[in-house]
From Swiss-Prot:
This is Securin. The gene is PTTG1. It is found in: Cytoplasm; Nucleus. Belongs to the securin family. The modification Phosphoserine is found at residue 165. Keywords: Acetylation, Cell cycle, Cell division, Chromosome partition, Cytoplasm, DNA damage, DNA repair, Mitosis, Nucleus, Phosphoprotein, Proto-oncogene, Repeat, SH3-binding, Ubl conjugation. The modification N-acetylalanine is found at residue 2. One of its GO terms (cellular component) is cytoplasm. It holds the Pfam family Securin. A motif (D-box) lies at residues 61-64.
């Protein structure tokens, strides 16, 4: 970019630019360049010199044309090959699906113990159904803990008791009478410990 700006300043016209390859030619003789139909003489510059590769002859452009022709031929030859590949991949896909179908029963036979991890039905523990002859819709069951009765006679006893009521818990002895002396409260908390064995030598 710096060389392009320098060439613009040298030519005096901001619109004319010289390519970097043309501007960096080596040699002591002045070279004549045609810019916008006029011939100008550019003198070799002093200062930093960059080693640029020599300009390629124009014959190489013909080689590029032949390369392009060769690539076009290779593209034409690759066209039918690409059409054959999808059919080949389709055959592979059908073979893979057949193999996958045949391997599904083999996987079930290889791991039969997976089904034995859960021998019970979890829904059995969630359902507490009563026979139709027992109607409990008329009972106020809000706040009643879940009770599982093993025998039917205990279930009949439960229906004979009537609607459930909260049961009063027996109060502990130290809360029964708040006017007791501390010694009487401590006497209720005393626990007899086994006698100490003094025969053991330390």
């Amino acid at each position: 970019m710096a060389t392009l700006i320098y060439v613009d300043k040298e030519n005096g016209e901001p619109g004319t630019r010289v390519a970097a390859k043309d501007g960096l030619k080596l040699g002591s003789a002045p070279s004549i360049k045609a810019l916008d139909g006029r011939s100008q003489v550019s003198t070799p510059r002093f200062g930093k010199t960059f080693d640029a590769p020599p300009a390629l002859p124009k014959a190489t452009r013909k080689a590029l044309g032949t390369v392009n022709r060769a690539t076009e031929k290779s593209v034409k030859t690759k066209g039918p090959l690409k059409q054959k590949q999808p059919s080949f991949s389709a055959k592979k896909m059908t073979e893979k699906t057949v193999k996958a179908k045949s391997s599904v029963p083999a996987s079930d036979d290889a791991y039969p113990e997976i089904e034995k991890f859960f021998p019970f039905n979890p829904l059995d523990f969630e359902s507490f159904d009563l026979p139709e002859e027992h109607q409990i819709a008329h009972l106020p069951l809000s706040g009643v803990p879940l009770m599982i009765l093993d025998e039917e006679r205990e279930l009949e006893k439960l229906f004979q008791l009537g609607p459930p009521s909260p049961v009063r818990m027996p109060s502990p002895p130290w809360e029964s009478n708040l006017l007791q002396s501390p010694s009487s409260i401590l006497s209720t908390l005393d626990v007899e410990l086994p006698p100490v064995c003094c025969d053991i030598d330390i």
